[in-house]
């Protein structure tokens, strides 16, 4: 599959949209799409992923729950690329983000609990970084904010060459217009990087109920190409070649043990109900004790 076809497949996005909702005083899944998206990436050390990391992250969830924080987030773990966990939180505005930070600072008990959790979690991590992105409604297609029934997230990262932002906009609009007509089920969200990374960085996100939707996206691509026609595909291919410097596509699985979601989600779907991390097996005691036995 050539570069353009791979890019096109990623932009096709299948069915459900990429709108991770965690807003001030609004339950995830019921609010409109917030504008500001904060993403924290945690790269785990070898052998420190899985339930070991889940247990450490559950301390953050418990701290937020005890404090009854109105700001929710979704945690997810990678199924491709370098082992890592992502934590996505959204706010209505940068002012709302500021108020959330101030509220945490003023809550001594919550701040202390988060500090303790961070120290324990840090022992498992190779590195950590954060990025802030802004939702672009114009380039998004039929985005849906409700992720309560979703289980996976596709994340495609595009780096646009300097001076080619208009070309990028033309590409996405061309793709959007055609998918809107040819593939009625298609949905996606586009976010532009605002802080924490290189300029010209865009995220195209899609949430999925199951991976069968990835299989269906191949058919969607065929329908798209047919609707574009030979001349349209040639023009699109040329724009992609001159404007997109690089792209990366990865898949993540939602992790309920790492997520702090609204009570509504937990009540309506067992997937989001907290589950205790597995405890190590305890060796059985001998029938009789030999006090002289050596350790």
Features from the language model and the residues they span:
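Short S/T/G/P-rich N-terminal loop/turn motif that feeds into the first structured element of a domain
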Residues: 22-295
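Short, intrinsically disordered, low-complexity terminal segments
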Residues: 7, 19-20, 24
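Bacterial N-terminal signal peptides
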Residues: 10-18
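Bacterial N-terminal signal peptides that target proteins for export
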Residues: 1-11
């Amino acid at each position: 599959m050539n570069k353009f076809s791979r890019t096109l497949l990623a932009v096709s996005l299948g069915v459900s949209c990429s709108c991770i909702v965690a807003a001030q005083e609004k339950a995830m899944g019921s609010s409109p799409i917030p504008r500001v998206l904060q993403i924290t990436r945690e790269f785990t050390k070898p052998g420190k992923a899985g339930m070991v990391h889940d247990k450490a992250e559950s301390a953050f969830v418990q701290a937020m729950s005890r404090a009854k924080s109105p700001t929710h987030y979704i945690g997810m773990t990678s199924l491709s690329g370098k082992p890592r966990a992502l934590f996505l939180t959204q706010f209505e505005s940068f002012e709302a983000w500021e108020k959330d930070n101030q509220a945490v600072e003023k809550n001594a008990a919550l701040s202390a609990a988060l500090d303790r959790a961070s120290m324990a979690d840090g022992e498992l991590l190779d590195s950590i970084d954060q990025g802030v992105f802004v939702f672009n409604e114009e380039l998004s297609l039929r985005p849906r904010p409700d992720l309560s029934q979703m289980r996976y997230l596709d994340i495609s990262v595009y780096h646009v060459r300097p001076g080619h932002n208009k070309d990028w906009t033309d590409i996405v609009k061309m793709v959007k217009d055609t998918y809107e007509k040819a593939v009625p089920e298609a949905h996606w969200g586009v976010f532009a990087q605002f802080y924490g990374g290189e300029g010209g960085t865009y995220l195209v996100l899609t949430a999925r109920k199951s991976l069968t939707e990835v299989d269906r996206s191949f058919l969607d691509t065929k329908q798209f190409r047919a609707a574009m026609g030979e001349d349209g595909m040639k023009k699109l291919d040329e724009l992609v070649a001159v404007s997109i410097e690089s792209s990366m596509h990865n898949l993540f699985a939602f992790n309920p043990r790492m997520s702090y979601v609204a009570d509504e989600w937990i009540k309506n779907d067992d997937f989001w109900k907290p589950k205790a991390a597995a405890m190590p097996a305890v060796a059985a005691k001998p029938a009789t004790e030999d006090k002289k036995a050596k350790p």
